[in-house]
Amino acid sequence: MTKTLTKHLQAIKDSKRGIFVPYIMAGDHAKGLDGLFETITLLENSGVSAIEVGIPWSDPVADGPIIELAGQRSLAKDVTLTAIIKKLQEKKTQVPLVIMTYINPVYEYGIEAFVKDLAETSVKGLIIPDLPNEHADFITPYLRDSDIALVPLVSLTTGIDRQKQLINGAEGFIYAVAINGVTGKTGNYRDDLDKHLSNLTAYADIPVLTGFGVSTEEDIKRFNAVSDGVIVGSKIVRDLHDGKEEEVAEFVTFGSHFEK
């Protein structure tokens, strides 16, 4: 069974538009979790393909300083994974949601219960950056009969054989990491990045999205030329926190309506 997220993003790719997925931190809002759907609606109205929702955690190994601070603000409001899932169960969204979390919160929640409860939301994808592919059986047996795709991350340092292993049988999309290190770094791209992304996109049979360090309209243009779209996190999180909703809407509209 082809999962909803795969079909949804593939349809956008087939329409010759760039896929655009913004990242937000759940609970990082003046209203806490009560403002979550306000932010989601703002992004939906700007035409996004899907929305990545971050789960705050005390040791976010893949997060750069902007997203880490957002997580700390959310944790200070006593936002938990349980509370986030309950909030997401209240209302269906127009576009698929993708949860980005770490192993420990899922383990503490209970893996089977986590997948079961997510199935009652609009979440169609799951990213766990500290879950090695060798240990994916931690959760894949529970996802197999669900409509939730486990999204693999592929970095520049990933060897060809390893890339093929990650890509084969992957669902949802391939998360291509544009820089070595944490989210939010900009301008530190390797010279062979475009070639790496082009090769990855040519080999994969599901959409390839470029993330980590993507923050400008020029980045959107560049990475849409060598992959199927982009994920933007730190810029969105920072601008939302600074109250720049109009600026966010304009930027997201540009990325969401980019024609190939």
Curated annotation (Swiss-Prot):
GO terms, molecular function: tryptophan synthase activity
UniProt cross-references to PROSITE patterns, sorted A to Z: TRP_SYNTHASE_ALPHA (PS00167)
Keywords: Amino-acid biosynthesis, Aromatic amino acid biosynthesis, Lyase, Tryptophan biosynthesis
EC main group: lyase
EC number of the protein: 4.2.1.20
NCBIfam families recorded: trpA
UniProt-listed HAMAP family: Trp_synth_alpha
Assembly with partners or alone: Tetramer of two alpha and two beta chains.
PANTHER family: TRYPTOPHAN SYNTHASE ALPHA CHAIN, CHLOROPLASTIC, TRYPTOPHAN SYNTHASE, ALPHA CHAIN
Listed name of the protein: Tryptophan synthase alpha chain
